[in-house]
């Protein structure tokens, strides 16, 4: 299964996918291209080091409509079967989302439907978790639709919020123990044909 991975920053989750493909933990999956939202994303260097083509498509430079067209054209040209948003801080355009319905997944660093939506990215969900005093947090892999963090939920994993946690320690633990576990799992489930969406709910087939 050919996938494209969209990134905006350091590419830690991208690296986890690269490593698990290399180790054989993820099978029958090939990263055809890494697409970054900006030229300064370190994820581009990770892609190059792994021999994966990388490209920058910037909504800021192109404008929303041209960005949507450029993204859709690029995905179609490389024959992508699944789009993976891994620390991608922009929103895909409506044409792209419609053309790849139930073929775009995102990793969110909280347990949707809590601490999600527009503006909830990076360190912010973890700050909000600690400010609210909740006792567990985690990560969610979900399909992408036209609204922020509202697509059908595929997988979730939780960790305890510790009394001495800071936003940074919580972010690091969730990334390692949740995000880098369930994002590769979701990719493998989709590659194996085990995910179906019925009435906007995800069912994992045995």
Give the location of each predicted region:
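One-carbon transfer enzymes
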Residues: 1-206
């Amino acid at each position: 299964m050919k996938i494209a991975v969209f990134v905006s920053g350091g590419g830690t989750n991208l690296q986890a996918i690269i490593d698990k493909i290399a180790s054989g933990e993820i099978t029958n999956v090939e990263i055809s291209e890494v697409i970054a939202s900006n030229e300064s994303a370190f994820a581009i260097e990770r892609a190059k080091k792994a021999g994966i083509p990388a490209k920058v498509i910037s909504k800021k430079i192109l404008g929303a409509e041209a960005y949507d067209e450029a993204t859709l054209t690029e995905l179609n040209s490389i024959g992508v079967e699944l789009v993976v948003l891994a620390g991608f801080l922009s929103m895909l355009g409506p044409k792209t989302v419609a053309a790849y319905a139930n073929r775009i997944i995102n990793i969110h660093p909280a347990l949707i439907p809590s601490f999600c939506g527009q503006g909830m990215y990076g360190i912010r969900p973890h700050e909000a978790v600690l400010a609210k005093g909740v006792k567990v947090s985690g990560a969610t892999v979900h399909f992408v639709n036209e609204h922020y963090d509202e697509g059908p939920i595929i997988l979730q994993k939780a960790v305890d919020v510790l009394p001495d946690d800071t936003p940074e320690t919580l972010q690091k633990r969730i990334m390692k123990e949740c995000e880098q576990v369930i994002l590769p799992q979701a990719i493998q489930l989709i590659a194996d044909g085990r995910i179906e969406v019925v009435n906007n709910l995800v069912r994992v087939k045995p």
